């Protein structure tokens, strides 16, 4: 069974026009927040010799690196990552004993 007539109506066809965008898409600031948190925790880990701060800085820096876009400033992200790695290395060079959780000092 073959239809020879086209069931569509040519006079009812309209070309699609996307609606005009009045607002810019919201920026995701997770990368910036994690970058700042990573730097703060890195400095706390370096200055106060807190290993858990240094490890939290590595965690925040890797989240910042994972969520970064190609257009983001890579120098800032890499420097934050290197600062957090150096905080971990320096905290373990000063005291090579395993890390104790922060709440362990509250019970003694």
Swiss-Prot record:
Record's bilayer topology term: Single-pass membrane protein
Basic and acidic residues bias: start-end ranges: 1-16
Residues covered by region (Disordered): 1-27
Subcellular location as annotated: Membrane
A GO MF label: protein folding chaperone
The entry's keywords: Membrane, Transmembrane, Transmembrane helix
Transmembrane segments: 77-93
InterPro entries according to UniProt: ASTER (IPR005351)
GO cellular component: endoplasmic reticulum membrane
GO aspect biological process, one term: protein insertion into ER membrane
Family (UniProt): Belongs to the Asterix family.
This protein's name: Protein Asterix
């Amino acid at each position: 069974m073959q239809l020879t007539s086209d069931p569509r109506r040519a006079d009812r066809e309209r070309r699609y026009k996307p609606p005009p965008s009045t607002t810019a898409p919201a920026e995701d600031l997770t990368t910036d927040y994690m970058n700042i948190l990573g730097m703060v925790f890195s400095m706390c880990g370096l200055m106060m010799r807190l290993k858990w701060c240094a490890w939290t800085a590595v965690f925040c820096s890797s989240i910042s690196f994972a969520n970064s876009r190609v257009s983001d400033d890579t120098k800032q992200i890499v420097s934050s990552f290197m600062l957090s790695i150096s905080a971990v290395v320096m905290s373990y060079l000063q005291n090579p004993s395993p890390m104790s959780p922060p709440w362990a000092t509250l019970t003694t």
